Amino acid sequence: MTRKFLSAFLLLVLRTTLAAAQPTGYIISARDAEHLADEAGLRTRVAFFTDSLCTGRASGTPGSLHAQSAIARQFAAYGLRPTGGSYFHGFRTISGSAAHNVVGFLPGSGDRYVVVAAHFDHIGTLAGTLYPGADSNASGVAALLTLAQMFHHLKELGKTYAHTVIFVALDGKEQSLSGSHYLWNEIAGGLLRDPRTGVPISQKSIDLMVNIDQVGGTEAPLHKNRPDYLMMLCEPENGRRDALLIANLNADVKLDLGFDYYGSKDFTRVFYRTISDQKPFLDHGVPSVMFTSGITLRNNKVTDDAESLDYGIFRRRVLAMFHYLARIL
């Protein structure tokens, strides 16, 4: 079974996104990339990251290395550029585990940046039992890779965006957000450089941080009989909620959207400000957004497996995030 998933995953890496030449006068639209957000592709990605090959993706394990390598291969296939000669940015977690963020740049036409991130680590294999972590957070990594593929496709068609997108697959989230803290320290220390210019990326040049954390589940809906939901947690004044509302309607996604955590100010504060990877950015004044479908009873259980996700709804969520980003880039 591992070989089957690995072969299918490699086909995604090799799958070309180049399109036939467009007729003169053709206006490139974000809709030209929608076909890349397909249920089969999302299912294949989640199946790979939850397979026994990745052993639950705990930081510092061989399974984590398999996950990192697969992410880097897809970054390369989708034209994302490494910085400092490598996609891998190594650090130690709070427990001392050797961990790596995977970082790739999709160049824009200006000198402003949007960070799009999702953590790939999970709790691993404990006492011989594999914890797959499909929703948490193979779903986020599958979404991240699909978004990278979609924006690369538009760039190949000739579309340009003002912002450079920094795609980051984060390690060490399960160890006190070690990966996102390390990413922030790279930025604060002038160590993260634009591969086009070699210029350090400063806090002031980042217009938005977008974190994708659990976007595959459907078991904790906002409203009865609406499993097709998505939450975007952000500050009202800088989260650009209107962009998501417009994207949800214009792209014909029509999800049930929420902008707080189930109506609770306290839980919204915890999930937005404390326990996910946008925290280091928020702590330093960078506008940030978190996309999530919320915690379910499957979290950190063996039942959080690839078959527990609804890939039709998952696809619609990816489309909503894609069109949201396309509007703000």
Predicted regions mapped to residue ranges:
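N-terminal signal peptide c-region/cleavage motif recognized by signal peptidases
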Residues: L14-T16
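His/Asp/Glu-rich mid-to-C-terminal helical/loop segments that flank catalytic regions of hydrolases
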Residues: T292-L329
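Alpha-helical metal-binding/catalytic segments enriched in His/Glu/Asp
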Residues: G104, V116-A117, H122-L177, M321
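Second-shell loop/turn segments in exported
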Residues: I28-L36, S52-P62, G90-R92, A127-N137, ...
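Metal-dependent peptidase/peptidase-like ectodomains
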Residues: D111, L170-S276, S288
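Solvent-exposed loop/turn segments at secondary-structure junctions
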Residues: L53-G56, F75, R81-P82, I94-S97, ...
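A non-catalytic alpha/beta surface segment that caps or lines the substrate-entry region
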Residues: F48, G56-L106
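Structural recognition of the beta-strand scaffold that forms the well-ordered cores
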Residues: F48-T50, N101-F105, Y113-A117, I166-A169, ...
